[in-house]
């Protein structure tokens, strides 16, 4: 029994090393292509440990936890770049390129406001509010969830419902100012849905979070 527990802990640590490294790279947004195969290697190691009968973290908990952390990190990094580093070469290339292809709010009057960065209506309010609240809360909740803590599971529920609210309000914002956000871009509404579809992850996680056996999480 002790040998089984030790093998399980070793397998979990080995998988988490790859998963954490991949998540950090993907969460940086710029290095996401490098991070994805590293992350998938961690998923494969965890899957192999489960097939070998070892007691490791459930795959669904692992995927939801890491993907929530990655989602929050990508948004926090991208918006922080626009909020703080908007005059950097990286921002002026990536953000205006994004604006030219998908969302003209990141191209229209870029760096002409007193704050700098995106000039899309309401965008700066979203950036300040969500970086300081929801994204940091979701990263903390994801870490607690991956550690199988009950507070992590509870805060995952709270922040996922907040994600639903954010998604709905952001859709309204993009619709209300469609004449600014979609004017002259290469991929207008269709392009926006292509990348925005990934933001429905809170919708997908909520049923599991409400129905999972809470006894698997510890105080």
Where do the PLM segments sit?
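Topology signature of small-to-medium multi-pass alpha-helical membrane proteins
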Residues: 2-16, 27-219
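Membrane-interface alpha helices of multi-pass inner-membrane proteins
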Residues: 21-27
């Amino acid at each position: 029994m002790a040998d089984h527990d030790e093998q399980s802990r070793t397998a979990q640590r080995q998988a988490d090393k790859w998963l954490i490294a991949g998540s950090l790279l993907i969460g940086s947004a710029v290095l996401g292509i490098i991070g994805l195969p590293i992350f998938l290697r961690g998923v494969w190691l965890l899957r192999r440990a489960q097939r070998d009968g070892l007691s490791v973290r459930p795959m669904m908990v692992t995927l939801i936890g890491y993907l929530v952390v990655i989602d929050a990190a990508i948004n926090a990094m991208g918006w922080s770049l626009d909020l703080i580093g908007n005059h950097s070469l990286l921002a002026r290339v990536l953000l205006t390129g994004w604006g030219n292809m998908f969302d003209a709010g990141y191209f229209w009057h870029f760096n002409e406001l007193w704050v700098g960065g995106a000039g899309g209506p309401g965008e700066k309010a979203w950036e300040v509010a969500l970086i300081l609240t929801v994204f940091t809360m979701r990263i903390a909740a994801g870490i607690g969830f991956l550690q199988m803590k009950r507070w992590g599971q509870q805060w995952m529920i709270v922040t996922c419902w907040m994600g639903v609210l954010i998604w709905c309000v952001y859709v309204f914002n993009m619709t209300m100012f469609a004449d600014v956000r979609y004017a002259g871009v290469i991929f207008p509404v269709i392009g926006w849905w292509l990348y925005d579809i990934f933001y429905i992850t809170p919708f997908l996680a909520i049923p599991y979070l409400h129905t999972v056996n809470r006894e698997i999480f510890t105080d």
